[in-house]
UniProtKB/Swiss-Prot annotation:
Native organism taxonomy: Bacteria, Bacillati, Bacillota, Bacilli, Bacillales
Top-rank taxon: Bacteria
Gene designation: yorZ
Name assigned to this protein: SPbeta prophage-derived uncharacterized protein YorZ
Length: 70
């Protein structure tokens, strides 16, 4: 089954990785390719550790109507 990366919208030929951005009450999941997962995971750790989910998504430019759960 072919999967599409939620971030870069490219087909995923290898592993599909779930990237979760969360805070105490809410979270959002992305099914993404290895390169997006690595890049965004590092950015979240280094730049967004004290931000809410909404502010993290805005900072990363991923605030395109993703369903925030919590």
């Amino acid at each position: 089954m072919n999967h599409i990366c939620d971030i870069c919208k490219e087909y995923i030929s290898g592993k599909t990785i779930c990237l979760r951005i969360s805070d105490e009450k809410t979270y959002v999941d992305f099914n993404c390719c290895e390169s997006c997962a690595k890049g965004y995971s590092d950015k979240v750790k280094n730049e967004c550790s004290n931000l809410s989910v909404k502010k993290t998504l805005e900072h990363l430019g991923l605030n395109i109507k993703y369903k925030i759960r919590g």
